[in-house]
């Protein structure tokens, strides 16, 4: 069999059908998972290119393999574009994921047993910020700060108190489910009081930072990590930034050979494409619309009587607290899924429900904003979500509401076609 003469449909009908059906699914639902987005055909083209064939251990100009001239150019482009996008002196585009980026920081700056202070998982933090289920909570002495019990906002006084008490080596500012802006300057002030490194994990808000819609952590944090998907609208991957080039040298060594072997050159090329797209004026307009849409979505749900955590949003995330409604996050997310609206169940701060059940749902606006949704469309989406939630409050069988909403979703989604 000559593999170069066969297309996917001919050689592997199973995978071909899976991809086809997933494409249909993405085209036919209202995608509200806050960590998801739709990349451009240009990003897809780079990611699916012959660069996937090339092994390139090491860094540009210092590879362990020959034949790296072209991939060196690709990586250099990605680095220079990332530095320009975030206005920083150092960028590493090799992390395979945001988690790998965070692990590289741990390896570069900490020793096993050192203390790390990060946001608790139930308050909106990430697994890699010290969760006991994660390496960060197993290898290091993890201490967590939370949010205020009344406002659900970060309590910076508590962060400072815990920092003074525990003297962390690393303080983390970042989240996976928090709808408000972060004060990186305040975090740095706290870090300096105890001699800690400050790491800003901007995986969710990188696009907002790049577009100038959120305070940049670059002037404040010693090190910044991110994913390249989500609001950056690039391929799934990681990114590390800094203005401290000495720390950058430590990060380089930690990532390779410390954590990873060969970088994924096709992904790095796709990152370069996404960074170029993010440097265009249209991208700033896109991010502004993402935030406007999130506020419209939150307001629409509030109008229908649903509790929005913190009373609203400053970014792309809307967290719906369902505790007073007697609905679990799992039941709500599953019912919405059947109605053509995709989101995820999410813990609410101080939630006593199992993380597999939860008391809330997390909604996000980046993906549908990419499709072209505007404020009025998200107002409608909010009402459709409320129709499903209302049905769940009144009956265990929500099929009637699901069918009605699915019909409305189908009409709406046809107005915004994207991948052919």
Curated annotation (Swiss-Prot):
Keywords assigned by UniProt, alphabetized: Cytoplasm, One-carbon metabolism, Pyridoxal phosphate, Transferase
Domain of life: Bacteria
Gene Ontology BP annotations: glycine biosynthetic process from serine; tetrahydrofolate interconversion
Subcellular location: Cytoplasm
GO CC term (a single one): cytosol
Cofactor (UniProt): pyridoxal 5'-phosphate
PANTHER family the record matches: SERINE HYDROXYMETHYLTRANSFERASE, SERINE HYDROXYMETHYLTRANSFERASE 1
Official protein name in the record: Probable serine hydroxymethyltransferase
Gene transcribed to yield this protein: glyA
């Amino acid at each position: 069999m000559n593999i170069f003469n066969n297309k996917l449909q001919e050689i592997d009908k199973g995978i071909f059908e899976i991809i086809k059906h997933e494409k249909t699914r993405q085209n036919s639902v209202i995608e509200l998972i806050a960590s998801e987005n739709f990349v451009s055909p240009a990003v897809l083209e780079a990611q699916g290119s012959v660069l996937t064939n090339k092994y390139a251990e090491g860094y540009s100009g210092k590879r362990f393999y020959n034949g790296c001239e072209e991939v060196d150019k690709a990586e250099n482009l990605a680095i220079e574009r990332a530095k320009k996008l975030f206005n920083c002196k150092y960028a590493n585009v090799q992390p395979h994921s945001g988690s790998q980026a965070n692990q590289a920081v741990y390896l570069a700056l900490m020793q096993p047993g050192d203390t790390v202070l990060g946001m608790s998982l139930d308050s909106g933090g990430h697994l890699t910020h010290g969760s006991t289920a994660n390496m960060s909570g197993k290898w290091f002495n993890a201490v967590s700060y939370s949010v205020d019990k009344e406002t659900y906002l970060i309590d910076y006084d508590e962060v400072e108190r815990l920092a003074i008490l525990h003297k962390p080596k690393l303080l983390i500012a970042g989240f996976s489910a928090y709808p408000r802006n972060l004060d990186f300057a305040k975090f740095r002030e706290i870090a300096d009081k105890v001699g800690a490194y400050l790491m800003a994990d901007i995986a969710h808000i990188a696009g907002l930072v790049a577009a100038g819609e959120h305070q940049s952590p670059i002037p404040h944090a010693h090190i910044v990590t991110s994913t390249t998907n989500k609001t950056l609208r690039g391929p799934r991957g990681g990114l590390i930034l800094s203005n401290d080039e000495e720390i950058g040298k430590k990060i380089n060594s930690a990532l390779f050979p410390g954590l990873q072997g060969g970088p994924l050159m096709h992904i790095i090329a796709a990152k370069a494409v996404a960074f170029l797209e993010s440097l265009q004026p249209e991208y700033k307009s896109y991010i502004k619309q993402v935030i406007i849409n999130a506020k419209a979505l939150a307001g629409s749900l509030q109008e229908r009587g649903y509790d929005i955590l913190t009373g609203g949003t400053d970014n792309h995330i809307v967290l719906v607290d369902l505790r007073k409604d007697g609905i679990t996050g799992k039941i709500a997310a599953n019912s919405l899924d059947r109605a053509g609206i995709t989101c995820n169940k999410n813990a609410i701060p101080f939630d006593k429900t199992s993380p597999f059940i939860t008391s809330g749902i997390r909604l996000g606006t980046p993906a549908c904003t990419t499709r072209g949704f505007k404020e009025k469309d998200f107002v409608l989406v909010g009402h459709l979500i409320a129709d499903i939630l209302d049905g769940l409050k009144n009956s265990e069988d929500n099929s009637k509401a699901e069918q009605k909403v699915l019909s409305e979703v189908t009409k709406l989604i046809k107005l915004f076609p994207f991948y052919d």
